[in-house]
Amino acid sequence: MQIEDFDFHLPEELIAQTPLKDRTSSRLCVLDKQTSEITHRSFKDITTYLQAGDCLVLNDTKVLPARLYGVKSDTGAKIEVLLLHQQEEDTWEVLVKPAKKVKVGTEIIFGNGKLKATCIDLKDHGGRIMTFSYTGIFYEILDQLGEMPLPPYIKEQLPEQDRYQTVYAKEKGSAAAPTAGLHFTDKLLEDIKAMGVNIVFVTLHVGLGTFRPVSVDSVEDHDMHSEFYSMSESAAKTLNEAKAAGRRIISVGTTSTRTLETIVRDHDGKFVATRGWTDIFIYPPYKFRAIDGLITNFHLPKSTLIMMISALAGKEAILHAYNEAVKEEYRFFSFGDAMLIL
C-alpha cells in the first residue's frame, strides 16, 4: 500500500490557526462506517449519537509547557530545548536547536539560572539526554519559564495557554494535546454522564512523532514512533463489562484508540490495568478489537492518523468525507472541527 493512496487536496486557509471561543461550537462531520453516509452537525449535537451504556474513553494526559529558551553557560549562545519524555526524576530526553552547539557536558541556563540543564548523552535527529538542576518544584518552574509546544502548522500565538489543553487534562507528560478532546466542556461531559454514558479515562502521553511526516513510499515500511500509555484497574473493569454486555466503546481521539487497541492486542482481547510503551501502527486492513466508534479531528494528508481512521471506516469513505469537508470549508487539524465515525 502506498503513502500516496492517503493524499487529498487541502487549501492552506482551512488549517485552523486559533481555537473557537466556544469549544462545543465546532462542526461535526458524522460518518456512518456501515453505509458511508455523511451528516453535517455541530459538536454540541454529539449527545444525539450517544446512548445509555456506552463507554466514552478520554485521554487525560496534560501538555507540558515543554519549550524552553536558554543560553549556553560558557558562550551565551541561544539554545532552544523541547522536553520529550522523562526518563528519571530529573533526566529527560529532549530536542535541542541548534543541535550542533550542544555536546556532552554542555550546560544550558534558563531564566537567569532558575533552571539549568547538562547534556549527558547524544541521540539521533537533534535528540539529547539532559539532567536538570533547580531549587523548588520542577513543574512550577516549567510553568513559569516554558511555552506550549504548538504544532508546526500553527503560526499564530496562542491567546490563552489552556486552550491547548483539554478541560479534564490531569497527568503531566505530553508534548502535544490529544486534540479530539478539546471540543468537550465540563457541562457537555456532565450532560453525557447524565444520559447514562460511562466516562472512562486512560493516559497516553503524546509525543512529537505524531507530527513527523511519513518519509517512505510504502506504508508497510514506516517506522512508527513509541508513546507511553497506562490504564487503571477501574477503567479496565468498566470496559470489560461493557464489552461482555455488547455495549459500545467510543474512543475520543487517535491516542485513546492506540491505548485501547494496544492493550487488547497484548492481553488476549481483554482490558487490563497496565502501563508501557506502544508503537502500534494501525492502517488498512487492520481489524479493530477494542473500539466501536471514534471521535477525532481532521488529519494531515498522508499521515499515519488518516491511515488509522481509514482502517476503521474504509479508505474510500474517509477520502470522500475529507473531500466533502474541504468543499464545506471545515476547519482542519488541532484547532479544527471534529468527525464522528460510528
From Swiss-Prot:
Catalysed reaction equations from the record: 7-aminomethyl-7-carbaguanosine(34) in tRNA + S-adenosyl-L-methionine = epoxyqueuosine(34) in tRNA + adenine + L-methionine + 2 H(+)
What is this enzyme's EC? 2.4.99.17
SUPFAM superfamilies given for it? QueA-like
One term of GO molecular function: S-adenosylmethionine:tRNA ribosyltransferase-isomerase activity
Q: What is the enzyme's class at the highest EC level?
A: transferase
Q: Entry's InterPro entries? A: QueA, QueA_dom1, QueA_dom2, QueA_sf
An individual GO BP term: queuosine biosynthetic process
Report the protein's function: Transfers and isomerizes the ribose moiety from AdoMet to the 7-aminomethyl group of 7-deazaguanine (preQ1-tRNA) to give epoxyqueuosine (oQ-tRNA).
Per UniProt, subunit arrangement is: Monomer.
Identification of the protein by name: S-adenosylmethionine:tRNA ribosyltransferase-isomerase
Q: Origin organism of this chain?
A: Oceanobacillus iheyensis (strain DSM 14371 / CIP 107618 / JCM 11309 / KCTC 3954 / HTE831)
